């Protein structure tokens, strides 16, 4: 174990900080040589760092290191992370050399943070308002008439006027330092700072469920990760109690880290930046994670590779992950998705802006037809509607910026239930909105004039060639399991992650598997699952035998009939951590699907989504069967009398569909008690009647 353990060193020079991970093995000289070569390539001005690296490598070759990694927080409290289960149970594999700050992972379409030779490297925690990255707070960018409407607006608008949420970009580090120094506690923070404004820094205080602990929501454009990211996530949450320190994959191809304490945020945020990830503008009135195709660049049926497009849009929104005050004071949250194929793996139909690939009928150039206005809320759910605009792929970020700035300045600052983009569109009418966006685009990008005025293009696959006959509907593909890529000799392997919940030891095991089979690349899906791309076909059978996928939790379906209910399972956080949720979801969802699979024979995949409340973070309306937390009552004998008492319950939705011809499901039954003795019989009846299930 000692020989296989990792050692983490910080090699400092006058200009750079390079995070290195070296394998401690008796044959570490080749590793040292490779490390030195990489260091010189990326840092030719730092020979002293090279010499220190050689010295450190020589030392670690001679001296075994304990398998437990000692991690010291910035508060000076030494915390020990014991070996994760993956070290012994899953078998720790040899890790790739990681130059976390400088490595470019080309296969992932991911470039980690680069060093600016002119200006020097600046940590996230070193940025200040008034600098070039943040010239002024977000409120300062609002036009006078927008501020006047905000002054008459809802309580959140007044809170933002009192102090802009973008202030949290900087203040999160001030709060963390004060807590580390013992000059304050989280309880002493202004409640609006702790529970609202810190969301601009991606921090969600779970006051109701886990007081003093935060969830951090990241920005992971297109769901692209590396093994180094996954290990960093595991190390981050692994120091906290097992019941709170977990990793969740979200329905936006994103990551949420749970159980984090505020004093540790600076270390975490700087570590994210060093790895090319960001936490800024992931909550409240900001644009959420950019969603794209999880099989971009490897899909045989791909129309557009969404990776660079999603990253470009995200870079525009977040100022390359540093934080962008200019777009940090929207009237409400905003979602953008970019589809790469007819399957629409990004679910564009439920986003404020959806980009759906389509060639220009005259030039043949591939671009996007734009749909707008999709969203879920307590009071209303809405599918996106056509905007009748086609844009070039190269103009996607520009178009999104024009829409966002127009929405920022003109969207409602009153009733927050009527502040999403669709309400502005309906107030203006689609023709008026379309013209306003075209004018805004031309004003912002005069050299691209007319780029947002091209009418939507006909989809060539909508009718059979040379006829007016509609083609057969395109069935959305299931990307779990093993699938051939467009690159000869390679496959992607889709892994089911039950309800999207990952424990630290599991994250370590996933990272090791990625290093062994997919060049360290990991991708996330909106169904809360994981994709390993670029797996050599000669290695697929070996991957399928990995212990992680054969212990009854994670699984890789081998046929369309394997795990018919578990494979499509999606769940929000539920009441375990979310104070808004009415019911517990994740554990209940996993258990119910397993019980139903044990008792029923189901010959087709059935997508089941759980969401804890009407906000529908679990997207119950797009599922074959959706279960939404709600009130229910059961009869119970109390003091000799039968009375109806309130219990956790669900409203059941049926008929949702995603893909080329999406449809939102409708309520089938309300007020069903969530207890299995009530829920299982009803679910069985639905599966038998609607999906042909039979008792085993």
Model-flagged regions — what are they?
Residues 21-22, 26-40, 44-89:
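N-terminal chloroplast transit peptides
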Residues 109-696:
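Peripheral terminal and linker regions in Fe-S/redox and tRNA-modifying enzymes
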């Amino acid at each position: 174990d000692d020989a296989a353990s990792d050692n983490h060193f910080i090699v400092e020079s006058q200009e750079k900080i390079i995070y290195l991970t070296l394998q401690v093995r008796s044959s570490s000289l080749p590793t040292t040589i490779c490390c030195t070569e990489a260091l010189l390539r990326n840092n030719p001005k730092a020979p002293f760092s090279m010499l220190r690296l050689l010295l450190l490598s020589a030392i670690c070759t001679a001296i075994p290191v304990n398998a437990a990694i000692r991690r010291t927080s910035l508060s000076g409290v030494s915390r020990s992370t014991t070996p994760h289960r993956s070290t012994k149970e899953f078998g720790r594999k040899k890790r790739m050399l990681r130059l976390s700050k400088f490595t470019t992972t080309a296969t992932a379409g991911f470039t980690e943070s680069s060093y600016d030779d002119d200006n020097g490297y600046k940590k996230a925690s070193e940025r200040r308002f008034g600098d070039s990255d943040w010239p002024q707070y977000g409120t300062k960018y609002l036009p006078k008439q927008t501020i006047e409407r905000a002054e008459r607006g809802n309580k959140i608008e007044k809170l933002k006027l009192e102090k802009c949420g973008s202030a949290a970009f900087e203040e999160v580090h001030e709060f963390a330092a004060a807590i580390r120094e013992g000059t304050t506690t989280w309880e002493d923070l202004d409640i609006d700072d702790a529970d609202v404004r810190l969301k601009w820094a991606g921090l969600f205080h779970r006051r109701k469920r886990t007081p003093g602990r935060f969830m951090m929501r990241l920005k992971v454009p297109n769901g692209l990760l590396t093994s180094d990211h996954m290990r960093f996530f595991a190390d981050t949450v692994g120091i906290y109690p097992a019941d709170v320190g977990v990793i969740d994959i979200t329905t936006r191809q994103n990551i949420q880290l749970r159980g984090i304490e505020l004093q540790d945020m600076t270390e975490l945020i700087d570590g994210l930046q060093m790895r090319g990830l960001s936490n800024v503008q992931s909550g409240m009135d900001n644009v959420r994670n950019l969603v794209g195709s999880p099989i971009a660049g490897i899909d045989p049926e791909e129309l557009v590779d969404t990776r660079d497009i999603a990253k470009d849009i995200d870079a525009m929104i977040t100022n390359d992950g540093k934080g962008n005050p200019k777009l940090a004071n929207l009237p409400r949250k905003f979602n953008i998705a970019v589809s790469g194929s007819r399957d629409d793996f990004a679910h564009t139909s439920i986003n404020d802006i959806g980009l759906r690939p389509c060639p220009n009928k005259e030039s043949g150039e591939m671009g996007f037809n734009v749909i707008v206005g999709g969203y879920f809320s307590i009071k209303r759910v809405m599918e996106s509607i056509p905007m009748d605009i086609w844009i070039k792929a190269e103009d996607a970020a520009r178009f999104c910026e024009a829409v966002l700035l127009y929405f920022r300045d003109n969207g409602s600052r009153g009733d927050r239930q009527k502040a999403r983009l669709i309400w502005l569109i309906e107030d203006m009418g689609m023709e008026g909105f379309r013209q306003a966006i075209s004018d805004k685009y031309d004003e912002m990008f005069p050299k691209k004039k007319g780029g947002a005025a091209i009418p939507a293009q006909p989809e060539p696959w909508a009718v059979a060639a040379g006829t007016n006959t509609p083609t057969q509907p395109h069935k959305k593909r299931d990307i779990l399991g093993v699938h051939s890529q467009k690159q000869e000799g390679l496959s992607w392997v889709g892994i089911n992650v039950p309800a999207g919940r990952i424990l630290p030891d599991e994250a370590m095991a996933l990272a090791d598997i990625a290093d062994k089979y997919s060049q360290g690349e990991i991708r996330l899906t909106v169904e809360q699952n994981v994709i390993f791309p670029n797996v050599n076909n000669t290695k697929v059978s070996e991957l399928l035998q990995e212990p992680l996928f054969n212990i009854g939790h994670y699984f890789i379906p081998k046929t369309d009939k394997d795990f018919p209910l578990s494979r499509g399972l999606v769940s929000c956080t539920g009441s375990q951590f979310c104070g808004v949720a009415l019911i517990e979801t994740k554990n209940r969802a996993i258990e119910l699907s397993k019980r139903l699979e044990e008792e029923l024979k189901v010959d087709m995949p059935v997508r089941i989504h759980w969401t804890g409340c009407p906000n529908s973070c679990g997207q119950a309306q797009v599922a074959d069967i959706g279960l939404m937390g709600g009130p229910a009552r059961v009869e119970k004998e109390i003091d000799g009398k039968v009375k109806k008492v309130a219990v956790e319950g669900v409203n059941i939705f049926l008929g949702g569909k995603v893909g080329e011809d999406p449809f939102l499901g409708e309520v089938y039954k309300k007020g069903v008690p969530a207890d299995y003795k009530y829920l299982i019989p009803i679910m069985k009846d639905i599966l038998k009647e609607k999906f042909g299930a039979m008792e085993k």
